[in-house]
């Protein structure tokens, strides 16, 4: 029993250390996300993937799909891909001035399937997997080499909404006021809310502006420099 308690306390201490630094969102590098997915999918002979060699087969497509989900680049519930975020996982050559044009030309050839293109569980997301694999190939072959470090990404719309709800509870703002938008600015605890959101999201966030634009979504558009509507 004492040993179990010690293990639990050690685990809690580790979690506090991690979240004390990151507060809420932990962004991984491509290699870290890939390492996770190789374990999730129980991929045999992962050597080729560790050296970033991805053949055009189902295993590679499943792996890329898992990595992109793990990195929060794609939201399957909304069928939304953040192309600008995707680009941050690749480093273009400093002397290359045409990488954006090449990548956009490649993306123009990528077909966007419906969210679910089959009623059979075994084929769930198969079309999306193929699309995301082709998008990955556009970035990998046209944009730049895979980034070795974890880039700083802004939270997704759904993540930011969750952070705002959590922070409202922490600082004592009711759900009614949270949905009140501009009325929040006169609340005595409002000044604490933006700071909590900033710390947990990892950056400066204009709360009221976000609430007024909460219906905005990222889409798979044919321009890697601006993927917001």
UniProtKB/Swiss-Prot annotation:
The keyword Ion transport belongs to this UniProt entry's keyword annotation: no
Disulfide bonds: 66-106
The keyword DNA-binding is annotated on this UniProt entry: no
Key words of the record: Disulfide bond, Olfaction, Secreted, Sensory transduction, Signal, Transport
Main location: secreted
Pfam families in the record: PBP_GOBP
Signal peptide (residue range): 1-20
Compartment list: Secreted
A cellular component term, taken from the record's GO annotations: extracellular space
Role played: Present in the aqueous fluid surrounding olfactory sensory dendrites and are thought to aid in the capture and transport of hydrophobic odorants into and through this fluid.
Protein name: General odorant-binding protein 69
Source species: Anopheles gambiae
